């Protein structure tokens, strides 16, 4: 990051964000392992038959049926991810498929032309990046995970601000890492996750910060 971001305060330009591949994929992997929503809820607007998937049989949902999707379980399924409990940001650069999951397209990084992973690569998404320097309007085509990765939902009802949120997080992380070194302030085993309206830590996560500009903590 030091070699890429020129601003002494760590605020990257759009072109610098494009070069911060590992930083962007670290954020994406964090969203895979610790997604904000515990579940997604969808309602069938008409009778629909879902493919067999890994269950070995098709499932028909009647019109009006509510469908609950467990995002945490989906993102950590060994059927959909290689070593799902391992933090591995570069997994998004490797293809992965499972022929036993009928109807699943797998992870296809060769379709990656955007900045962040998402559920599919079939559409263009418009976002506005607002920074102290510019307002940038761009169209990004994302790469396909075929709905194995849905931290912001998917389809027509997915979060409208997902790209802005990820760009904002990249800028924030850049600023923090430019200024501080971080160290976990407790035993990792003490950090417990619980579910409410979001998935979050039970009692926070103590972190020690050391200024990179001085010896003060």
PLM-predicted stretches and their roles:
Residues 42-43, 71-73, 91, 153-154, ...:
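Active-site proximal loops enriched in glycine and acidic residues that flank catalytic Cys/His/Asp
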Residues 1-37, 44-46, 55-65, 82-94, ...:
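Cytochrome P450 I-helix active-site segment
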Residues 34, 69-118, 134-141:
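Conserved cytochrome P450 K-helix/beta-meander segment immediately N-terminal to the heme-binding cysteine loop
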Residues 126-128, 149-152:
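Short FAD-binding loop at a beta-strand-to-alpha-helix junction that anchors the flavin cofactor
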Residues 200-217:
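C-terminal helix/juxtamembrane-tail motif
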Residues 65, 71, 169, 173, ...:
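Hydrophobic, repeat-rich solenoid/adaptor surfaces of innate immune receptors and signaling proteins
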Residues 136-138, 144-145, 154-156, 162-200:
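Cytochrome P450 heme-binding "Cys pocket" and the immediately downstream C-terminal segment
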């Amino acid at each position: 990051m030091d070699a890429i971001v020129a601003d002494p305060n760590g605020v990257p330009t759009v072109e610098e964000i494009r070069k911060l591949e590992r930083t962007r994929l670290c954020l994406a992997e964090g969203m895979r392992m610790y997604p904000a929503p515990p579940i997604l809820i969808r309602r069938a607007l008409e009778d629909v038959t879902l493919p067999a998937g890994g269950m070995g049989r098709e499932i028909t949902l009647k019109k009006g049926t509510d469908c609950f999707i467990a995002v945490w379980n989906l993102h950590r399924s060994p059927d959909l991810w290689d070593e799902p409990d391992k933090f591995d940001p570069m997994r998004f650069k490797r293809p992965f498929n499972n022929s036993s999951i009928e109807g699943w397209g797998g992870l296809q990084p060769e379709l990656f032309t955007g900045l962040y992973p998402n559920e599919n690569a079939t559409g263009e998404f418009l976002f506005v990046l607002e920074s102290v320097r510019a307002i940038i309007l761009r169209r990004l085509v994302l790469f396909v995970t075929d709905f194995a990765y849905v931290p912001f939902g998917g389809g027509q009802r997915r979060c409208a601000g997902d790209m802005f949120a990820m760009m904002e997080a990249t800028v924030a992380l850049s600023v923090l890492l430019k200024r501080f070194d971080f160290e976990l302030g407790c035993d990792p085993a003490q950090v417990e996750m619980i579910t409410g309206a979001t998935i979050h830590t039970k009692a926070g996560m103590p972190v020690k910060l050391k200024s990179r500009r001085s010896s003060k903590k």
